[in-house]
Amino acid sequence: MNADAQSTDASLSMREPLSHASIQEMLRRVVEKQAADDTTAIGKVFSEAGRAYAQDALPSDKGEVLKISFSLDATQQNILRANFPGRRTVFSNSSSSSHCFAAAHRLLETDFVYRCFGNTVDSIIDLGGNFVSHMKVKRHNVHCCCPILDARDGARLTERILSLKSYVRKHPEIVGEADYCMDTFQKCSRRADYAFAIHSTSDLDVGELACSLDQKGVMKFICTMMVDADMLIHNEGEIPNFNVRWEIDRKKDLIHFDFIDEPNLGYSHRFSLLKHYLTYNAVDLGHAAYRIERKQDFGGVMVIDLTYSLGFVPKMPHSNGRSCAWYNRVKGQMVVHTVNEGYYHHSYQTAVRRKVLVDKKVLTRVTEVAFRQFRPNADAHSAIQSIATMLSSSTNHTIIGGVTLISGKPLSPDDYIPVATTIYYRVKKLYNAIPEMLSLLDKGERLSTDAVLKGSEGPMWYSGPTFLSALDKVNVPGDFVAKALLSLPKRDLKSLFSRSATSHSERTPVRDESPIRCTDGVFYPIRMLLKCLGSDKFESVTITDPRSNTETTVDLYQSFQKKIETVFSFILGKIDGPSPLISDPVYFQSLEDVYYAEWHQGNAIDASNYARTLLDDIRKQKEESLKAKAKEVEDAQKLNRAILQVHAYLEAHPDGGKIEGLGLSSQFIAKIPELAIPTPKPLPEFEKNAETGEILRINPHSDAILEAIDYLKSTSANSIITLNKLGDHCQWTTKGLDVVWAGDDKRRAFIPKKNTWVGPTARSYPLAKYERAMSKDGYVTLRWDGEVLDANCVRSLSQYEIVFVDQSCVFASAEAIIPSLEKALGLEAHFSVTIVDGVAGCGKTTNIKQIARSSGRDVDLILTSNRSSADELKETIDCSPLTKLHYIRTCDSYLMSASAVKAQRLIFDECFLQHAGLVYAAATLAGCSEVIGFGDTEQIPFVSRNPSFVFRHHKLTGKVERKLITWRSPADATYCLEKYFYKNKKPVKTNSRVLRSIEVVPINSPVSVERNTNALYLCHTQAEKAVLKAQTHLKGCDNIFTTHEAQGKTFDNVYFCRLTRTSTSLATGRDPINGPCNGLVALSRHKKTFKYFTIAHDSDDVIYNACRDAGNTDDSILARSYNHNF
């Protein structure tokens, strides 16, 4: 045993040392083997890198983490998470600002609104948005309107452009540009189904906004703005989380916003425009309407939604409903009428009542306690002090057991004494009315308002006992509230909701807008006029000014209007009964009642006049544009006529010399293409109707040929429309390029000024030598110098910023084939059609070789559906090179030929892969008397590239001859084909003597697919084909095709690969039209072995089920598929 060990060591020592190349090869094999297994260390690295690459390539979605760099404390972060619960956010706290929370909230608002649309492809317009932020998070379908309305907007634009430059410098792989314009939303030329705005519509009238949305075809608009329902009832307030204070100047119709710790960030808006977003529920444009809904309130920032109303007709009701934005704030509020000391002017002696908002629950509780504690002989000062103390404890912070609680709604300390005085007066009046109520109850009489509220009117200001005596003299009818408020202008509601009446200057006299009039000797002429109108003087009151110790006599008058209102109230029965505790028609009013009494307006704003004006302007612009174009055409026609006249003169006088000043050289005409007279094309050789000019449809197969013409035109038109849409989306610039590849990763864009191709990956190359490209002016021709564009071509394209190509630009076959089809319509056709419908591998190619006449006078015309079949036939059929060139070719090549050869017989291979109209047209142009078509009706048929086009005449019809014996497929494959795939051809037999050939190989990834340079690799989709071609271990395997591309091919070994677990109709074979045709082609290409490499274990996979069935079937059963007569 020791001897064996010594010999082994000796042999090892004699081995040559490993070279560097062999070590590299070993490492490569190990990495490739372990990369597919994510449980290994190497597999984990590749898995994480692949996931990161895929996430980076995809647009922003709700599952992606949103990074926020602003410095925020834990409370602010929790508020953001609560406001946006469906968003994964990471707070890095890397940048500091005094308004970090507002900035972070704005970023999340933008993300929230963008995800509401659920669309990352179609164009979306952002009013005043930050195009740099959109580019960073890959919102490439967003166009930003960034108008410069003032210097502040210009500064913001400068900051964004500098930030964009810095970002692009750090990310050189970015090719596209930021998508923005400097026009207002109203003037922007972009159209989209969606639009949104983040804090940028506060100064934009909602009617004007809706008109612009309608003009641009916007169906859904979502905006956010800093707005609070308290703005409807208060003059000032704060938004705590955002650290913002707002104040309304109702005289100037302005609302001011200020960041408390950032004085330079304040801004102002027109309050009347801002208020519309809170109060209106619809916008009526006359011909259209938008519904306004307040969807969400983030505690100071509201999400407002404008949705286009489909099917709207003029005068249709809007069903406005009740606005939820303000109702809860209004419902629990009471308006308390008060009077303050100091509301007296020595020149005018004008008293003013002030209105204070008090919480309804607080007012009820305090009034009830004050009534229980009322003592008729007690001092009024002490009672008012007690009531003021209760108000303070009920509306401010209270500490109970060390815990601070807020009791009720905060009330300004300046309002304690006035509100307490009014409550005391109300309680005293109720107490004094008790005897009279008892006597009236005893008499069974109803109590009238005038009996309860008897007394007289008087001035109201606080001056000790004088104020109480003045309050006691007020006499107002029971329906004063509604009548007085409805008589006020709508703008006066602002003063009704005022909490800051104490800010009035003494130098500015403030009048009470109620029907009470207080005049002195200065207004003697007015007093006399009032007296003539029926107003009586009922009392003169002497008032002492405590500051100047002067006495003034004031005459009080009751207006004629009040008399009439009182009489009508009595006649109509509007006499109030005993009031509840806080329901007083003079001093306590529900804010909800005030709202409906004063704001007597609809909830839908009528913007039809503005819409008509806007539409008229658009119509005038279009008319002017049309007139300008018509004038250009007319001028061009005049110029052309003049040139033709000069040309005719020169032809008529060849020896007369040129006319001075009118000579036109060819170089001059070449510089101006518009002046070039197009050469008329020769008419095709077919008859036309003399009257209508239409082609005479002589061909008996005209229905199929016409359908082929319409189909080719539709595919060409679709290609033009698609490329134009791509250009329009990008505005024919490099903006938003990442969206271009979303629908088709084979699209490419060429930037002439940079001489660069752009695609879905960082380094994208053209997939073919494109014949043409789409520019903003239409198709342009491309010329190639090897693998790159010719220098002269690039120079001619430099007038365009960008051009686009797709697969339709490789070769424009449709435009070249259609003239031949139109020509065939006008020609007679006398040929018979015989269809050899055989199973896969029945010897169609061998049969063609046997029957084809390739020499002599009657040479057969042999056409195929694809180039690979034509090349195969050229190698099989023995004939001269000239015959192969003209008589063995593809159908498209023959129809595009300028001089089509004639033949007595047409042989067409794989005839069901081509539209029947093209086959009939080729036979007509060739002057054939017989057509023989070879194909398989149950293999892949003609596939339309226009899903919306409906075919009725695409299948070749004629006499059918069937062949049910295959020479290619082994016995187990034939068994599967007959059982699972062929429905109309039975029984299927084989002349092959191979019994078993099928094997199922489960894999975890494409890396596990076996390498065989002589095998045919098949898959169902182009995506799977691209994955196979990208595998490093399959380099050199050139035979990788889809099942559609492989139809007609034959190989000894076929490797079919399914690389996705998604179940589709291609895998299940349950396509409602084509059935399992793709699986039939896949399983019928091999002669010796068929290996099915699959990631999925899908019980619905028709190939998988067939292969497993064949593997479990006894040999004797499989042998029944042999052709025993062979």
Swiss-Prot record:
ATP binds at G838, V839, A840, G841, C842, G843, K844, T845. It is a peripheral membrane protein. Keywords: ATP-binding, Helicase, Host endoplasmic reticulum, Host membrane, Hydrolase, Membrane, Methyltransferase, Nucleotide-binding, Transferase. It is found in: Host endoplasmic reticulum membrane. Gene3D superfamilies: P-loop containing nucleotide triphosphate hydrolases (3.40.50.300). GO terms for molecular function: ATP binding; helicase activity; hydrolase activity; mRNA methyltransferase activity; RNA binding. Residues 90-278 form the Alphavirus-like MT domain. Signal peptide: none annotated. InterPro entries: (+)RNA_virus_helicase_core_dom, Alphavirus-like_MT_dom, P-loop_NTPase. Residues 964-1125 form the (+)RNA virus helicase C-terminal domain. Its EC number is 3.6.4.-, 2.1.1.-. Residues 806-963 form the (+)RNA virus helicase ATP-binding domain. Residues 834-1094 are annotated as: ATP-dependent helicase. SUPFAM superfamilies: P-loop containing nucleoside triphosphate hydrolases (SSF52540). It holds the Pfam family Viral_helicase1. Residues 69-406 are annotated as: Methyltransferase. One of its GO terms (biological process) is mRNA modification. It comes from the Viruses. Its main location: host cell. Interacts with RNA-directed RNA polymerase 2a. Involved in the virus replication. Contains a helicase domain and a methyltransferase domain. The methyltransferase domain is probably involved in viral RNA capping. Involved in the formation of ER membrane spherular invaginations in which RNA replication complexes form. This is Replication protein 1a. It comes from Alfalfa mosaic virus (AMV).
